[in-house]
Amino acid sequence: MGTGKFHIARYVMDEATGAYVADGAVRSLEDDFGFCRYKSITGINAIGKQKGVYTESYPESDSLRVYVDPSARQESISSTLSVCVFGSDPSLPSTLSTEELVKSAEDSWHELVGFLRGGLILWTDDYRQRKALFVLQDAIDPTTDSIKGLPYLDCKVKLQNIFGETFGSADETIENWLKLGGKGA
């Protein structure tokens, strides 16, 4: 993987082994889906509410009684990936008609959504040196807009962060969880 890129890999359950396995090659968000351009991702630095923490208060006490599970995990959190999908390279003039540009953008968009659906998505962000494991659950309804007369699709993809946090690029928590079929971490 090069620097300064957003990579996505899809994982599906292998029924024979019970492990999640890569479904094809790792793909670059901006290089492998036509003229898809990253806009933002929300929640990438968020951490979900900690599970396994219990508190009780009693009228006769000034403090809480607290139990913290030593192997506590976070609840999953939502992230929204925003991308702009163009029908041609937005940095170059195009000879395509508006209809052809929109059709090309729609084709690239459908290719991206087809990749995101039906599996778990390992997101690797070279800029932040972080990675996360997502699943696509919600409906997506892109809108059409234009910049300087160039039409594009403005797409917001709501993803669920399975672990409720991101990990450093060198961390193996996600890969180990995938190998164990979603059990343990």
Task: Kindly give the residue locations of the regions a language model identified.
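Extracellular/virion structural assembly segments
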Residues: 1-185
